[in-house]
Amino acid sequence: MANPVVSPESLLSEYADGPARLEAALTGLSDSELDLSLGENAWSIRQIVHHIADGDDLWKTCIKAALGNSDGLFTLQWYWDRPQMEWAEGWSYASRSVESSLTLLDANRHHIVELLEHDPGTLEKSIRLQPPHGTEVRITVREVLEMQVRHMTGHTQDIQAIRQAHGV
């Protein structure tokens, strides 16, 4: 099912508001409650926060590449070569404070929105993308922003589900 087309202003607003929505989902949680999850093999709230921030940081590079070099080829093959759980373990998602990740997420989103607001045509700029499996495609800045908004929304819902399951 295709996403309804939203105005550039609405998309940028939703993208910019992501960190505040994530912070709202975390409001009132103690440090130990950040370690709650839906099960033994499920990510904790803490791990989800780090995952969101790191994913956003990775895709920020795609946006900047599209703005500066539409003939370039963007790939995250180095990242896609390993399962996400290996990155989570290697980057200590389970034990690190979430503060630096929340700060990074907010700064990255603010930086990208500021870049995009200075040129009305930026959302349609694109770059070649080599996905992990399959053929090269062209991806627009709009598509990356939409993907990041969906990613944030999905994981914010995951956090709400964890909170509900544990009554916090």
Q: Can you describe what each PLM-predicted range is?
A:
Residues 9-13, 60, 64, 102:
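Generic detector of well-ordered alpha-helical segments enriched in charged/polar residues
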Residues 17, 21-47:
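Long, hydrophobic N-terminal alpha-helical segment
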Residues 12, 16-19, 42, 49, ...:
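Generic structural concept
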Residues 1-17:
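Extreme N-terminal tail/first-helix region
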Residues 19-30, 57-64, 106-120, 153-156, ...:
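Structural signal for well-ordered, non-membrane alpha-helices
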